[in-house]
Design a protein with these regions (language model features):
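Positively charged n-region of N-terminal signal peptides that target proteins for export
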Residues: 1-4
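Conserved hydrophobic positions within beta-strands
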Residues: 37-41
Length: 156
């Protein structure tokens, strides 16, 4: 009996640590200062607890940045908003050009949390955050993401 109680305690502690670590997007990402960018989807995964997406962003000088991101919303909320797995995967297939509203990772690098996605027609593609606004470094609504000189490198 003591063995089972110990095992149950261990499982509960591990689960609690995972849950508290997971629900920290404001700690992990700068969601107060969102930026926008046009990007090309390279991979989209409709996963729990949050879908993930890889995208390429081309700078004005032609340099391509390869980004990893997760969506703020979860598959259950996406489905309730009409974005089923098949519809989301079709809308975000590799090669699709989208406008993203992103909160950059607080540790630097090319990772972030996507708060909103629009297609080339300006329609909200995935998610329920239609009121999200992004700015560029000059403070222009709907602007572009700050350049590499404005981001710190990971672990600095």
């Amino acid at each position: 009996m003591k063995k089972w109680i110990g095992l149950l305690t261990l499982v509960l502690l591990m689960t609690a640590a995972t849950l508290s670590a997971h629900h920290g997007s404001a700690i992990s990402y700068d969601t107060a200062h969102l930026w926008t960018t046009w990007a090309t989807v390279t991979q989209f995964n409709y996963l729990n607890p949050h879908p993930s997406m890889k995208f390429d962003r081309t700078l004005k000088d032609g340099t391509v940045e390869h980004w990893d991101s997760e969506l703020l919303t979860n598959p259950s909320a996406l489905a309730r908003a009409g974005w089923t797995k098949s519809r989301s995967i079709e809308a975000l297939k590799p090669g699709t050009r989208v406008k993203l509203y992103v909160g950059t990772s607080r540790v630097g690098g090319f990772s972030g949390i996507v708060m909103k996605i629009e297609n080339e027609q300006g329609e909200n593609v995935v998610g329920e955050r239609s009121n999200v606004m992004g700015v560029d470094k000059e403070g222009v609504a709907g602007g572009l993401q700050p350049g590499p000189e404005d981001r710190k490198e990971p672990n600095q």
